[in-house]
Structures are given as C-alpha cells and as structure tokens.
C-alpha cells in the first residue's frame, strides 16, 4: 500500500478562505416603475467579469471577483448592477508557478456561487426575475489574460 504522507518534509499545499465580504454593491433601475411592466421581448443582458488579487502578507491574499450586469431594451437601460465580492485567502505550500492559477482560477471559483446569489437576490429585489449568471470558466479567463499580457509584452519589446 502506498504511503500518502509527504515524506520529504515539505508542507502540503493548502488553500483556505479566511473571510468573504461584499466590497461594493449597486443596483440601478433608472426606468422604474415603467421598466417593471410586461414587455414583448426579454432585454439584452451583458455581463462582464473581472478578477483581481493583491497580497496582504506572504501567505494571505485579497481576491476580488467583480461582476457587472446591464440589461438593455434597445438603447434604454432596464437595470444595471455591479458587485465587487472579495475573499481573503491563505495560500501556502504551492510552488511559485502555481500561485497565479490558484489566485485567478481557484479563488474566484470558490467566491462565484456567493456572488451569483447576491446578483440574483438584488435583481429580484429590484422587481425583475432573478438574474442567474451561468457558471464561469475561470481557467479560460486566466488563459486569455495570460495570452493578452504576453502579446502586450511582445509589442512593448519591439523597438521603435
């Protein structure tokens, strides 16, 4: 039987949530009460997602998941909501090359269900059906972010 204990003395990687919090929340219903009337078609909803991470110490990081949703009927805003939902994470024992994926994939993945519920509640409380945001592929978002940063670095490295 294989021994699952780490025998080389190195600590096994750990990821813990120390705190979760709403950093910023806003909901705008500029056309109320007219915007609450029945409509022929559903509004167009655009959702933007962003993740930021900042170190608090060698092992503790503040990760903020930002969700911005805007519903429009033609050129008129039906509702607009913004949420910055944060978590303080303790990240220890990971190799350095795994730190960014942990912070930008795993941490927001843990925050997302809570942020999604807040958005659903605030849109429902604003008089609309709850906005249930589809699951987000944070791995793909991170890969896209890395590719954009690499492309930017190549452009900046080209002499004029």
Swiss-Prot record:
One of its GO terms (biological process) is protein transport. GO terms for cellular component: cytoplasm. Pfam families: SecB. Keywords: Chaperone, Cytoplasm, Protein transport, Translocation, Transport. It is found in: Cytoplasm. SUPFAM superfamilies: SecB-like (SSF54611). One of its GO terms (molecular function) is unfolded protein binding. InterPro entries: SecB, SecB-like_sf. One of the proteins required for the normal export of preproteins out of the cell cytoplasm. It is a molecular chaperone that binds to a subset of precursor proteins, maintaining them in a translocation-competent state. It also specifically binds to its receptor SecA. HAMAP family: SecB (MF_00821). Homotetramer, a dimer of dimers. One homotetramer interacts with 1 SecA dimer. Belongs to the SecB family. This is Protein-export protein SecB. The lineage of its organism: Bacteria, Pseudomonadati, Pseudomonadota, Alphaproteobacteria, Hyphomicrobiales.
């Amino acid at each position: 039987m294989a021994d699952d204990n780490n025998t080389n003395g190195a600590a096994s990687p750990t990821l813990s949530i120390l705190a979760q919090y709403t950093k910023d929340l806003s909901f705008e219903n500029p056309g109320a009460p007219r915007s609450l009337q029945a409509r022929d078609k559903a509004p167009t909803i655009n959702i933007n997602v962003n993740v930021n991470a900042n170190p608090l110490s060698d092992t503790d990081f503040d990760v903020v998941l930002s969700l911005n949703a805007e519903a429009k009927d033609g050129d008129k805003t039906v509702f607009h909501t913004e949420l910055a939902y944060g978590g303080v994470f303790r990240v220890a024992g990971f190799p350095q090359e795994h730190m960014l994926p942990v912070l930008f994939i795993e941490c927001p993945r843990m925050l997302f269900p809570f942020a999604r519920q807040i958005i659903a509640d605030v849109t429902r409380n604003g008089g609309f059906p709850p906005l249930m945001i589809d699951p987000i592929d944070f791995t793909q978002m991170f890969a896209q972010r890395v590719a954009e940063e690499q492309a930017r670095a190549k452009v900046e490295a080209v002499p004029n």
